A protein has these predicted regions:
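N-terminal export signals
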Residues: 5-23
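N-terminal capping segment at the start of a domain
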Residues: 29-61, 77, 84-86, 183-192, ...
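Second-shell loop/turn segments in exported
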Residues: 31-37, 52-61, 147-156, 160-161, ...
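Noncatalytic luminal/extracellular "stalk/propeptide" segments of secretory-pathway proteins
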Residues: 36-40, 45-140, 144-150
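Catalytic-core environment of secreted peptidases
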Residues: 40-62, 71-80, 140-148, 152-153, ...
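Soluble metallo-hydrolase cores and metallopeptidase-like ectodomains found primarily
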Residues: 107-133, 188-261, 272-279, 283-286
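Metal-dependent peptidase/peptidase-like ectodomains
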Residues: 243, 291-396
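His/Asp/Glu-rich mid-to-C-terminal helical/loop segments that flank catalytic regions of hydrolases
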Residues: 286, 401-438
């Protein structure tokens, strides 16, 4: 029994009703005749608009603006629109700071949030050593996890260390986050997870200063305050067509910061594919979905799968536009990161057997993704994992990281028109070839 069958057996309920899908041919494309919706310039303009909405945490003003932007775009094309609620903890803070003498370090409070008194928690900053956990009892633990050059930030190891510090009796944690950029690197968090002590992230670029504070035994104050509570984002679903099997195009829209290279290419390509799709003479119905709640470990996607996704037997194809597959590469140098005009190599494309030869042809020459990984639920990452868990017979999905992944500096400049355009055209070529063979 697969995941979908388990959910059906448990009686998953829809979050919101949906009217009938618009018949094919209704509505007028937003793009004027002759416009190339797959041009790199057009894709880049959408990435810039998305980043311009600001921070994309679930239910934030930037996240809600993105949902409305998607809904308006798809509605103007003639799609039937449904929006469903995605409730998640409010991850914003009013203060996230460490002070030591006259030094002040503002950082990122790592969810799940645990707040300090408004006056902060005072104490000694003590290095976390797994071999002697009692060292941090009653103290503020200082956590650093090294990484190999070129590797992504070891988020899972940091998460384990935070939990271990809490179990050892630490009153709080300050983490110097190892990563390519030297900035804080937020970690995706299960929506039901709890942590009993406050955790402040600071960038690795501050590590030498933090080491000095620990070495001299200075008194420090850790302060994390905020509104707390929960807030609601939206999954936005667009349907088009009256009959035939479904083609599903999914992309996450939310994240900890502005998510330019992480989310931007998927956002832009989803919008472009929606214009292209309704111009095709194919015997299918189209469903596009932009999910909130992603940074809460795929929470919004999970709700969509439970309540709104068509059944696998009703679906001809599912293509997931995940993280960082259209981001740009960076070289790590002693002076810092140097942006390149080539695609980020830390990316993956996984596909079911029917799509592999089509992808190999369409993506030829595109490093890494020209050789798709065979579909394997035990190796799938990101929201494409849910697609495979539920047994959808035909599909493909991207995921990846990048040098600015989950950092406050992941802006629109973390991708380029020249990187995105060939990916966009290859995706459309594969989808078109698959559906014309139905």
């Amino acid at each position: 029994m697969n995941r979908r069958e388990l959910m059906v057996g448990a009686g998953a309920l829809a979050l919101a009703g949906c009217g009938p899908a618009s018949p094919a041919g209704e509505g007028l494309p937003v793009a004027a005749a002759g416009d190339d919706v797959f041009s790199g310039a057009r894709l880049m303009a959408d990435v810039e608009t998305y980043v311009g909405f600001g921070t994309h945490r679930t239910g934030s003003p930037g996240d809600l603006a993105t949902s409305d932007w998607f809904a308006n775009h798809w509605r103007e094309l003639g799609y039937e629109i449904e929006q469903t609620e995605v409730e998640a903890p409010n991850a914003d803070t009013t203060v996230a700071r460490l002070t030591a003498g006259g030094a002040v370090f503002d950082g990122f409070a790592q969810p799940p949030l645990s707040f300090t008194p408004e006056s902060g928690l005072a104490g000694k900053l003590v290095r976390w050593n797994p071999a002697s956990p009692a060292d941090v009892s009653g103290r503020i633990a200082y956590v650093y996890v090294a990484r190999e050059p070129g590797a992504v930030s070891p988020g899972a190891a940091y998460r384990q260390a935070f939990q271990a510090c809490a179990e050892a009796g630490a009153i709080g944690v300050v983490a110097a986050m190892s990563g390519p950029s030297g900035e804080v690197v937020a970690i995706n968090t299960p929506v039901t997870m709890t942590l009993t002590i406050p955790v402040l992230q600071l960038g690795e670029k501050l590590k030498s200063q933090l080491d000095g504070i620990v070495d001299v035994g200075s008194d420090v104050t850790l302060t994390i305050t905020g509104p707390g509570g929960a807030r609601k984002g939206k999954n936005t679903i667009a349907r088009y067509g009256a009959e035939g099997p479904w083609v599903i195009i999914s992309t996450p829209q939310s994240g900890w910061f502005t998510c330019g290279g992480e989310r931007g290419p998927g956002i832009a390509m989803s919008r472009a594919l929606a214009v292209w799709a309704i111009k095709q003479d194919l015997p299918v119905r189209w469903l596009f979905v932009a999910t909130s709640g992603h940074e809460w470990t795929d929470h919004g996607a999970d709700l969509f799968h439970q309540n709104n996704a068509p059944e696998p037997a009703e679906t001809a194809l599912w293509w997931h536009l995940g993280a960082s597959y259209g981001a740009r590469a960076h070289d790590e140098t002693p002076e810092g990161l140097v942006a390149k005009d080539t695609p980020n190599p830390v990316r993956a494309l996984m596909a079911t057997p029917d799509l592999v030869p089509l992808i190999e042809k369409a993506f030829s020459g595109q490093a890494v993704i020209e050789t798709p990984m065979p579909a394997d639920v035990s190796k799938a990452l990101g929201e494409y994992r849910l697609v495979l868990e539920e047994g959808y017979p035909s599909g493909a999905g991207f995921w990846g990281g990048n040098a600015h992944f989950h950092t406050p500096i992941d802006g629109a400049e973390n991708t380029t028109p020249a990187i995105m355009e060939p990916i966009m055209r290859a995706i459309a070529d594969v989808i078109g070839a698959k559906l014309k063979a139905l």
